[in-house]
Amino acid sequence: MKTQRDGPSLGRWSLVLLLLGLTMPLAVTGRILSYQEAVLHAVDGLNQRSLDANLYRLLNLDPRPTMDGDPDTPKPVSFTVKETVCPRTIQRSPEECDFKEDGLVKWCVGTVTLNQAKDSFDISCDKDKRNVARLGDILQKAREKIEGGLKKLVQKIKDFFGKFAPRTES
């Protein structure tokens, strides 16, 4: 006849089940990403969904807003990406690619979660409005210089033709 001593005791099985139960949530939860890692993950997702010919790479990450500690809660993000020289069809990390000279810059906003198991982001990107504003400033300065140059040119033309005008002596 077998006794309890011959087989594993109920206490040992309880301990094994307890340890399994403690490790299961860790496997389901996954790794917690840093704010920057979550944004880089979102950039990878944007590249996968993009119809553009080249990959985009993170150019600038706006400062991290104050956030709660829950990695499952979506966190607001704002960043810019710039077009690289690498075609989207190659299997390469965007961080390995150089930025394309005069490449398209996009301003992106949305949310990311830091829990990698959730793998959640909701990002939308537009052409960088800040670059458009800078272009407007450049065009304004160019217009002012052209206007100033034209005024000087008109005055020189008047002075030149003024020399040939008949003079009346009084």
Swiss-Prot record:
UniProt KW keywords: Antibiotic, Antimicrobial, Disulfide bond, Immunity, Innate immunity, Secreted, Signal
Superkingdom of the source? Eukaryota
Electron transport recorded as keyword: no
Q: How is it modified after translation?
A: Proteolytically cleaved by proteinase PRTN3 into antibacterial peptide LL-37. Proteolytically cleaved by cathepsin CTSG and neutrophil elastase ELANE.
Q: Which cysteines are joined by disulfide bonds?
A: C86-C97, C108-C125
The UniProt entry, under InterPro entries, shows: Cathelicidin-like, Cathelicidin_CS, Cathlecidin_C, Cystatin_sf
- What is one Gene Ontology biological process annotated in the Swiss-Prot or TrEMBL record? defense response to Gram-positive bacterium
- Quick one: where's region Active core? 150-162
Output the Pfam families linked to this UniProt entry.
CAP18_C, Cathelicidins
Record flagged with keyword Secreted: yes
Q: Which residues are annotated as pro-peptide in the record? A: 31-131
- What is the annotated localization of this protein? Secreted; Vesicle
Q: Which PANTHER family match?
A: CATHELICIDIN (PTHR10206), CATHELICIDIN ANTIMICROBIAL PEPTIDE (PTHR10206:SF2)
Q: What is known of its domains?
A: The cathelin-like domain (CLD), which is the propeptide part, does not seem to exhibit auto-inhibitory function, as it does not inhibit the antibacterial activity of antibacterial peptide LL-37.
Record-given protein name: Cathelicidin antimicrobial peptide
